[in-house]
Regions:
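Alpha/beta-hydrolase-fold enzymes
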Residues: 114-198
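Short beta-strand/loop motif that positions the catalytic acidic residue
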Residues: 219, 225-227, 231
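Catalytic nucleophile-loop/oxyanion-hole region of alpha/beta-hydrolase
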Residues: 48-51, 77-107, 274-275
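Conserved alpha/beta-hydrolase
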Residues: 53, 58-82
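Active-site glycine-rich loops that stabilize anionic/oxyanionic intermediates
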Residues: 38, 46-49
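Short alpha-helix in the alpha/beta-hydrolase fold that links the catalytic acid
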Residues: 221, 235-245
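An N-terminal hydrophobic leader/cap segment in hydrolases
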Residues: 1-21, 25-34
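Catalytic active-site module of serine/aspartate enzymes centered on a nucleophile-bearing elbow/loop
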Residues: 255-292
């Protein structure tokens, strides 16, 4: 079922719609359309947050000629269902494939794919699995490796079998999201964010993050990896391991930001500007390559 895209509301907020998954789950979509766009981007958000937190980034893309769609992953934002819950271990991958192909069917050219944190993991795994084949992939602080202990990772695997949807606090340290105190304050007060995770979701993150690193040499398309070296929410060593393995593919461009926190696109200035400068440069080079 295709998402029906309404016109932009008169109050200036982004158009929204719903899209049904094969198992009956409905996902909430947000669009930042652009007449005459030269391209498009699908954004996949991270754990506990939602697509509405990407308005500022979507506006940045709009200014550069890209239409944007975001969606609230299952268990998140305005999408209904248990917070942080999954029915099956690969639900988030199946959802991304459905949303991506639905969006692509409405466009003259397939969209770029951008994933942040857990969304970066979902995006990377979906590309490596061949579920989606965007013209390019952008990964921001992807959750490829956790700060959790090996014992906790093993416990998540066990609990995913016996109590897969047991609600647990995700333990995210809000103060390590960004150096911008307003970003942190807005996150704390955001009624659509949540602080939950389930064993099945945790096991997916741990397991598939390791799989992404193991399979990185098979990276099939141009990819920009943006890494916050002072990330306190995901272990940047996972991105470094991914970059080392992906080097042989010839597809990966990696940019490290030594003092920045997890949410690179929401960092305090001048950090945010430096990140966006690198993103703009990479996008420009992809455009030139596509024209050759």
């Amino acid at each position: 079922m295709h998402a029906a895209l309404p016109n932009r509301p008169a109050d200036g907020t982004e158009p929204t719609a719903w899209l049904d998954m094969a198992d009956g789950q409905r996902l909430f979509l947000r669009d930042w359309p652009l007449a005459g766009a030269r391209g498009a981007v699908l954004i996949v958000h991270g754990l506990g947050e939602h697509s509405g937190r990407y308005r500022r980034l979507a506006a940045w893309f709009n200014q550069r000629g890209y239409a944007v769609r975001g969606y609230d992953q299952r268990g998140h934002g305005k999408t209904p269902g248990r917070r942080g819950g999954l029915r099956h271990g690969d639900d988030l991958l199946e959802d991304l494939a459905t949303v991506y192909h639905d969006y692509a069917s409405s466009l003259p050219h397939p969209p770029l794919l951008l994933g942040h944190s857990m969304g970066g993991l979902v995006a990377a795994r979906s590309v490596l699995d061949g579920r989606v084949a965007p013209p390019a992939l952008l990964l921001s602080s992807p959750a490829l490796r956790s700060w959790e202990s090996p014992g906790m990772i093993r416990l998540a695997r066990v609990l995913s079998r016996i109590a897969p949807n047991l609600p647990l606090r995700n333990g995210l340290d809000f103060d390590k999201l960004s150096h911008d105190r307003q970003v942190v304050a807005d996150y704390r007060s955001d009624p659509l964010r949540h602080g939950w995770i389930t064993p099945r979701l945790a096991d997916f993150i741990f397991r598939d993050g390791a799989r992404c690193i193991a399979d990185a040499a098979t990276l099939p398309l141009p990819t920009l990896l943006l890494v916050a070296d002072s990330d306190g929410l995901v272990d940047p060593a996972g991105s470094r391991a991914f970059a080392r393995k992906a080097a042989s593919s010839g597809q990966l461009t990696t940019r490290f930001f030594s003092t920045l926190y997890h949410e690179l696109f929401n960092e305090a200035e001048p950090g945010r500007g430096q990140v966006l400068m690198q993103l703009a440069d990479w996008l420009g080079r992809q455009t030139l390559s596509a024209r050759r």
